Design a protein with these regions (language model features):
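Conserved mixed alpha/beta catalytic, RNA-binding, or beta-rich assembly cores of soluble enzyme
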Residues: 6-68, 88-91, 113, 119-123, ...
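Short beta-alpha junction loops
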Residues: 80-84, 111-116
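Short, acidic/small-residue loops that bind anionic groups at enzyme active sites
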Residues: 97-114
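Short, Lys/Arg-enriched N-terminal segments with co-localized hydrophobic residues
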Residues: 1-5
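Mid-chain, well-packed structural core segment of small domains
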Residues: 62-93, 97
Length: 151
């Protein structure tokens, strides 16, 4: 509604392969409401947690979800790195389903837009040809200029 300020608190879970990532692309896209954060166009966003899954098969998912909910998270984003890394996370569907069921929280696959270099490589490899990937990558697809700005 116009005139009413809305606020959402989110947590971000990244792939453990990127545990040393400073989170710059995720935070930039959150600030600019790009990629999967475009759904919050007119909403104030507060980050209440940022951690890794703890590596395959995701030993930290249960704890991270619980901690984020305790910190007030309304939604958890599974970082774009989980879908653009090679290979993409084989547990992403399981993580999403678990967090939604266990904590009754909204789970969004993706953070920043898929960089062009990753889109090109995964297109070449056919990684995302299976129809199951379409809804997973959709929130992080963006126009070409935006994708290139995340290369």
């Amino acid at each position: 509604m116009k005139g009413i300020e809305m606020k959402i608190k989110i947590g971000i879970i990244i792939c453990d392969r990127y545990r040393r990532c400073a989170g710059g692309k995720c935070l930039r896209s959150m600030r600019n409401r790009e990629g999967a954060f475009s759904i919050y166009a007119d909403t104030e966003v507060e980050l209440v947690g940022f951690t890794t899954c703890d590596g395959c098969p995701g030993g930290n998912i249960e704890y991270a979800g619980e901690e984020m909910v305790k910190n007030g998270a309304d939604a958890v984003h599974l970082a774009t790195g989980m879908i653009v890394g090679y290979p993409p996370c084989p547990y992403i569907d399981m993580f999403k389903a678990f967090l939604e069921k266990r904590y009754g929280i909204k789970v969004v696959v993706g953070t920043h837009p898929i960089p062009t270099k990753y889109l090109d490589m995964h297109t070449h490899l056919g990684t995302w040809e299976d129809d199951a990937w379409k809804p997973l990558i959709a929130p992080t697809m963006a126009d070409e200029v935006t994708r290139e700005s995340y290369d």
